[in-house]
């Protein structure tokens, strides 16, 4: 995980990457207006949840993807937004990758790995990714995720958009082996 990714995107780096790909001065001007319309600190930050921010994030982190695949030559790598994992049979290799990744992020993209979210674990303990624990034959929602879902639903109970929230969480749980939890949520909140 990258520490405060959306708040830390460097405008100069992002614009430089866009200029490599886009030749139209008009489009570049428009994108520059969008980028400079939001700042968390001088010259940094893109708004969380904005459609353009999702595109900008993928363009920005494509540099990370290329570094991981072509320079580090990590065979098993997966990224979704600013969350990513890579796998190796060798713990020493993982530690070396992390060290090189930190340097690349700081020097090239002006980003920082979140120190509390670096996690080295055995594959048979599952992969903790995007709120799920992914195991060889099944996927579970993370305990913290289950607690957060329950808390959010209790907060929204009786609100106008409660059913939408419940349906959204049930949709999220469909990607996991969480039949019992889904059934319990329906029974508890819909009765």
Regions found by a protein language model. Name each.
Residues 2-81, 85-101, 105-108, 112-121, ...:
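Conserved polymerase palm-domain catalytic core
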